[in-house]
Amino acid sequence: MADEALFLLLHNEMVSGVYKSAEQGEVENGRCVTKLESMGFRVGQGLIERFTKDTARFKDELDIMKFICKDFWTTVFKKQIDNLRTNHQGIYVLQDNKFRLLIQLSAGKQYLEHASKYLAFTCGLIRGGLSNLGIKSIVTAEVSSMPACKFQVMIQKL
C-alpha cells in the first residue's frame, strides 16, 4: 500500500514540476505533455525489460497486448485493464474504468481538460513497453467521464 501512495505522489509531483517549469519559462508550455510522455516511455522500457526477463516469447501482437493489460497493468496500477478491444488491424483500445492516476481529481466536467496532463506519462509507459517488445506504436488517451479513460494504441507497421 505504501508503494502505491508513493507512486501516486511521485506522479503528481512530476506533473506539477513539469508544468511549473513551463510557467517559469524553462520549458515551452506545449512541450509539457511531450516531456511527461518521454519520461513514461523510458520507464516503460525499463519495466518491460524487467517483467519479461523470465517469460516465454510472445507468439503474436495480441499476446503482447494481453500481457500489457493483465500482468504489466496489474504490477503498475494494482488492477487489470477492464476492457481490451481490437479491430484486428493494428488498433487496440484499453479501457480502465477507475484509472488510479485520475481518481484523485474531482469528477466535474471542468476538470476534464486537466486530465491529459495526468495521462501523458501513462501513454509513454505503454509506448515504451511495446517498443521494448519490438512494437512501434502511437498511444493516445481520452477521458469522457472521470475517472474512466481509454487508451488507443495504433500499431505502426514497419
Swiss-Prot record:
Q: List where in the cell it is found.
A: Golgi apparatus, cis-Golgi network; Endoplasmic reticulum
Q: What is its main location?
A: Golgi
Q: Name one GO cellular component term.
A: TRAPPII protein complex
Keyword terms: Endoplasmic reticulum, Golgi apparatus, Neurogenesis
Which terms does the UniProt entry file under GO BP?
A: endoplasmic reticulum to Golgi vesicle-mediated transport; nervous system development; vesicle coating; vesicle tethering
Pfam families linked: TRAPP
Tell me which Gene3D superfamilies the record gives: Trafficking protein particle complex subunit 3 (3.30.1380.20)
Tissue specificity, per the record, is: Widely expressed. Expressed in lung, heart, liver, spleen, brain and kidney.
Q: Which family does it belong to?
A: Belongs to the TRAPP small subunits family. BET3 subfamily.
What is this protein for, i.e. what is its function?
A: Component of a transport protein particle (TRAPP) complex that may function in specific stages of inter-organelle traffic. Specifically involved in the early development of neural circuitry, likely by controlling the frequency and amplitude of intracellular calcium transients implicated in the regulation of neuron differentiation and survival.
Q: How does it assemble?
A: Homodimer. Part of a TRAPP complex. Heterodimer with TRAPPC3. The heterodimer TRAPPC6B-TRAPPC3 interacts with TRAPPC1 likely providing a core for TRAPP complex formation.
What protein is this chain from?
Trafficking protein particle complex subunit 6B
Which species is this UniProt entry from? Mus musculus (Mouse)
